[in-house]
Amino acid sequence: MKKARILIVDDSSVMRKIVERSLRQAGLEIVQVLEASNGAEALVVAQNNALDLILSDINMPVMDGLEFVRRLRNVENAKNVPVIMITTEAGESAVVQALSNGARGYIRKPFTPEQIKERIAPLLEG
């Protein structure tokens, strides 16, 4: 598994830290964790950094995760970066929309480090 540069997008700074801690507890090799509090900030980070993976919430102010994923697919250096949605969304419609916008999968909150590893490790192999 390669050492990864990961962007975590969530409007809660506490949740961003929980996700980062879970990534490390899962034993994933991480070079750098970048953070953004909404989709608009995340687009700027994605445009200016070589990323290996993005983990994004769906419900955020300014630009939600669904719009972020849709717009990310038009960013030349980031259009192929895998995105996993991390969400409390109980309904399937938001998840289906995220997948149709280009997300590679989703993880429901609350989650365990094992769930994080199961979903993310295959995307970081190579």
Describe the residue ranges of each PLM region.
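Receiver (REC) domain active-site loop signature in two-component systems and cognate sites
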Residues: M60
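Active-site residues of response regulator receiver
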Residues: D57, T87
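C-terminal output helix
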Residues: F111-I120
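Two-component/phosphorelay signaling modules centered on CheY-like receiver
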Residues: S13-L34
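Conserved Asp/Asn-Gly motif in the active-site loop of CheY-like receiver
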Residues: V33-A40, V95, P113
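Acidic, metal-coordinating helix/loop segments flanking the phosphotransfer/catalytic sites
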Residues: E35-L53
